[in-house]
């Protein structure tokens, strides 16, 4: 499954390689 690294924008389903999808001022990004 395609996933995003920390600091990258989450996919629409919130798929992160590690960490969680969090809402930030720049949109949703993957964070630990």
UniProtKB/Swiss-Prot annotation:
Q: What is this protein called?
A: U13-ctenitoxin-Pn1a
Q: Any one cellular component term from GO for this entry?
A: extracellular region
Tell me where in or outside the cell this protein is found: Secreted
The primary location reported for this protein is secreted
Cystine links in this protein are: 3-17, 10-21, 16-30
Q: Looking at the keywords, is Disulfide bond present?
A: yes
| Native species | Phoneutria nigriventer
Q: Which UniProt keywords apply?
A: Disulfide bond, Knottin, Neurotoxin, Secreted, Toxin
* GO MF, any single term: toxin activity
Q: In which tissues is it expressed?
A: Expressed by the venom gland.
Q: Does the keyword Magnesium apply?
A: no
InterPro entries registered for this protein in UniProt: Toxin_29
Spell out the family assignment given in the record's similarity comment: Belongs to the neurotoxin 17 (21C2) family.
UniProt free text on domains: The presence of a 'disulfide through disulfide knot' structurally defines this protein as a knottin.
- Role according to the record: Acts as a neurotoxin.
Q: Which Pfam families has this protein been placed in?
A: Toxin_29 (PF08116)
């Amino acid at each position: 499954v395609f996933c995003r690294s920390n600091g990258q924008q989450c996919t629409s389903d919130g798929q992160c390689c590690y960490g969680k999808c969090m809402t930030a001022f720049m949109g949703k990004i993957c964070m630990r």
